[in-house]
């Protein structure tokens, strides 16, 4: 089923500008509260000027350009400006440091970078090291350093025409983006995303939340992440909705921003839900227009119930990853939700639970979640320059091995158990980290929790819990272990616990377990 119809991203924006014109397309709010707003017509002009900017710097179809930016309108300009001339965006996680960023530049062979003043010192050092092909930096900000190979984005963009000066032939099969995975356990892999992938994501995710042109979709997710791009921005623009992009997440400001922009849809991760719940209760908690909150794993039933009751919202569960582009399993519009199920497989996909010999399993049995899609269309095309990694993850028939454990019930609802690499082997027993984290998170003194496996000479692995307490609370080891013993099987009780002020996280809120031992 082809729902894109050969329409690439250049055509999409030209059509949107013509159809929606002066309707508000994008609202951006900075951490300082400065608001910038663009209609569909004016946003398309900004995108065209940015495309011409890249052309003036020598960028042509197939060239790769890196973006290292926090949320800002310029990210949107660059993303679609590159797509309009057939060039390829390589977004870099804004939290990455020098060595990690240089590795991505080297592996994607990027010569041009767009970044902001706060990240410039790091990239100046990278250029001086001559370890990457990077030879030019386009800088967003008021002050421009007097360095060779540096240009000012705003000044250069303002000089460009709002009409495209370079229009190569584009196909929906062309690569639009190389998005590097978060790499919480190893080096990231470059996920190749096509024009078709992004167009499909817009239609699919709009269907998933029944998005209309009178909706306002607000997100705090980072623009360099698949969630912001393919479950927020693309559906919002594809449906002619208003997309509200906030620079950073603030638990204190979140609900005021929801009300200020009259948001009807937003997306949340567990970290957001937990930090919102520790804010003081207010009479305005349920005074908003939200009809759906897109939710990504993982949350205990107690946390879910407390959040939905306090704020009067529905959580729409969506399961996916960078490689699936969208939430390929999830709740459907109008369906009764079956918590803790992650929902049913969406249109254009198939899903199975398979054993270690790659054989389908019956309902109720735990195995690997496998998804069938069309590479380069409904799932990613490949890992950039990594054919062996692509072959391990993606079968020739289009079956993608997610690396996640789960099961399905007799009615076709799927249930997530854990990342297969997130299982702890303890004395012959497989212990799910997610299961333990959900149990421990119910302790009233605990704000955040993660468990990891550490080497144990006798039992393969021991279990260690890292804990963040609610403000002003104290928790003794005796109290912690007693709680665990009363709420889980003996072999699942952690052997060690450590209290921390925070936990290391990547851009999507996932805890970076390789930094904890």
Curated annotation (Swiss-Prot):
PROSITE patterns: AMP_BINDING. Keywords: Ligase. Pfam families: AMP-binding, AMP-binding_C. InterPro entries: AMP-bd_C, AMP-bd_C_sf, AMP-binding_CS, AMP-dep_synth/lig_dom, ANL_N_sf, CaiC. It comes from the Bacteria. The keyword Lipoprotein does not apply. Coiled coil: none annotated. GO terms for biological process: carnitine metabolic process; fatty acid metabolic process. GO terms for molecular function: carnitine-CoA ligase activity; crotonobetaine-CoA ligase activity; medium-chain fatty acid-CoA ligase activity. It catalyses: 4-(trimethylamino)butanoate + ATP + CoA = 4-(trimethylamino)butanoyl-CoA + AMP + diphosphate; crotonobetaine + ATP + CoA = crotonobetainyl-CoA + AMP + diphosphate; (R)-carnitine + ATP + CoA = (R)-carnitinyl-CoA + AMP + diphosphate. Pathway: Amine and polyamine metabolism; carnitine metabolism. Transmembrane segments: none annotated. Its EC number is 6.2.1.48. NCBIfam families: PRK08008.1. Catalyzes the transfer of CoA to carnitine, generating the initial carnitinyl-CoA needed for the CaiB reaction cycle. Also has activity toward crotonobetaine and gamma-butyrobetaine. Belongs to the ATP-dependent AMP-binding enzyme family. This is Crotonobetaine/carnitine--CoA ligase. It comes from Salmonella dublin (strain CT_02021853). The lineage of its organism: Bacteria, Pseudomonadati, Pseudomonadota, Gammaproteobacteria, Enterobacterales. The gene is caiC.
